[in-house]
């Protein structure tokens, strides 16, 4: 039996994040220590990645399950009331940017 895998994303194990005034998310790796302030649309993507958790929830919870690029794209599109095809390129670019900053890790999902 063959199990199909797809590209997915998981949070890096050494990150910290917080909500600042206005609810914006600031994320960083503990090693770099340089926070990355997310845009409003970035906040929506981040909320999908963390499963709607708060930073306080993250302190005591197991890490969120990895999500496929498709799952992230569909959930973001739903949040904005758009078709997934309309947001796919922007979502993928944002995920790759978070990966470049060490906040996300690319994985294979079943």
Where do the PLM segments sit?
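Long, low-complexity, charged/polar intrinsically disordered regions in eukaryotic proteins
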Residues: 1-33
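Long, charge-rich, low-complexity alpha-helical segments
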Residues: 31-110
């Amino acid at each position: 039996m063959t199990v199909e895998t797809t590209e997915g994303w998981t949070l890096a194990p050494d990150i910290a994040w917080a909500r600042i005034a206005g609810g914006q998310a600031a994320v960083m790796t503990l090693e770099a220590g340089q926070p990355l302030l997310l845009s409003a649309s970035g906040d929506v993507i981040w909320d999908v990645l963390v499963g709607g958790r708060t930073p306080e929830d993250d302190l005591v919870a197991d890490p969120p399950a990895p999500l496929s690029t498709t799952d992230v794209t569909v959930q973001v599109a739903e949040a904005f009331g758009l078709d997934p095809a309309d947001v796919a390129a922007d979502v993928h670019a944002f995920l790759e940017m978070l990966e470049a900053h060490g906040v996300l890790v690319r994985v294979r999902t079943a």
